[in-house]
Amino acid sequence: MIKEEREFFDVAAKPWRDVPQSKCAGLRERILSGDPATGNYSRILCFDPGTDTTPNGVLTHDFWEEVYIVEGSIVDLRLGREFRAGQYACRPPGMPHGPWKSPGGCTTFEVRYTKD
């Protein structure tokens, strides 16, 4: 199966859900498109104000991940750096990142995909 073909649609019509694999409260996502067979998907990720992802630990993935911060900011607790709206990351498989804290909240647009 591949991602569904979609022309523009109202993103607000997609429901928010808690991030299933997260061990902490305050992370919600809207899946915009996805392919369950490959795990490739695009989503909007929301950190509620005060969210701390320390329970999730440092993350690494076996897929590529691109992240654009739409609004707000997050602090990488491992690096001790704050990243703000307008900044972008491209993470290859295996790149460690997080945990994160977002004192004022943050919204990101993310694309995850395998190399092949």
Language model feature labels by segment:
Residues 55-77:
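Glycine- and acidic-residue-biased ligand/ion/polar-headgroup-sensing regions
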Residues 45-47, 68-74, 107-109:
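Short, well-ordered beta-strand segments in beta-rich or mixed alpha/beta enzyme
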Residues 1-41:
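A short, N-terminal "cap"/entry segment at the start of jelly-roll beta-barrel domains
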Residues 30-61, 80, 92-96:
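Conserved short histidine dyad/triad with adjacent acidic residue
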